[in-house]
Amino acid sequence: MSSLQIDPDEVFYPSLPSGRPDTLPAYKIFRYPSTQLTVPVFQAHWAKGTPLLIEGVLENFEIEWTPDYFIREYGTQSCIVVECQTETNKRVTVGDFFRQFGRYDNRQPVGSSGDNADGGGGGSGLGPGTWKLKDWPPSTDFKAAFPELYDDFSQAVPIPSYVRRDGTLNIASHFPKNTVAPDLGPKMYNAMASSDQKGSKGSTRLHMDMADALNIMTYAANAPDGSPGCAAWDLFRCEDSDKLRTFLKERFRNIFQHDPIHSQQVYLDYELRKELWEKYQVRSYRVYQRPGEAIFIPAGVAHQVVNLADCIKVAIDFRTKSEQGLEGRRVAVAVYDVVCVVILFPAGGAAAEATVKGPPQC
């Protein structure tokens, strides 16, 4: 591990989009241009178990990951989209979904009957609501489904020795060949604009991953008000996880069968984040991600996302040996049956396989 010291006077990420005052306390995230993120710099940050933002990643891509590209190349493919508020789903084509990006005029909230014959979906068949195409492709390996995108993504990621499937410092790349390896991605996360106001379920509800992750935004339409599009992230420190769980159990009694974070049932809107701060002094890294920006999320960091515009993102999981948030911890994983969960814990650099039975204790 590098002994490189992090300069406390470094420029932090200028998080607030124009016209969006945010009065809640938040941690500031370190940022680096893609060209300046070296392995020693990354290791110095990663040893602290804190998230990191990288700028200018889009310059490394050769393919334009935009709605037009996906309409042209995959528009006739069938896909399942999910409504962010209700979790209901429907089958449409990829083209139906992406043609709505940036078209806000006819959109209506879920539950609205709409004045238009198409139900508020602009002729797409989507109907009212905020729709997302997540974990795409859902079952097929990304490399097999989209070989050209896989190659483009692999050559564009920052710190490839850690992030790529075949990265020499990625423990997941050393998984035994004679076993079924976990699907660590890449996966795409495409969602329409949502809101972080009272009652919103966001775009991705609060959850925690057992693997490290890199999430890159490749495209954002302008927001409904015409401002540059972005997505708002809340990332919570590992050491605040127990307070976060206590708050969720107190605030949402009797809705969790298992761990309240891993259940992925709650989005902490502005009012809930305010209450969390006032009661427990827990704040998040509040980060506004824009096109070309990549966020590194350490394993064990609870996080949630709300798209403030229509956004396209691609993410991949990886494993390192220095996960401060997981060492010495029991990881709570919500399981409803006897499931073989592959957990790549850094025990002497070897992969470990654990069988989890029943809902674990926090």
PLM feature segments, named:
Residues 6-47, 60-294, 301-340, 344-362:
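Active-site region of the double-stranded beta-helix
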Residues 54:
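Basic nucleic-acid-binding interfaces
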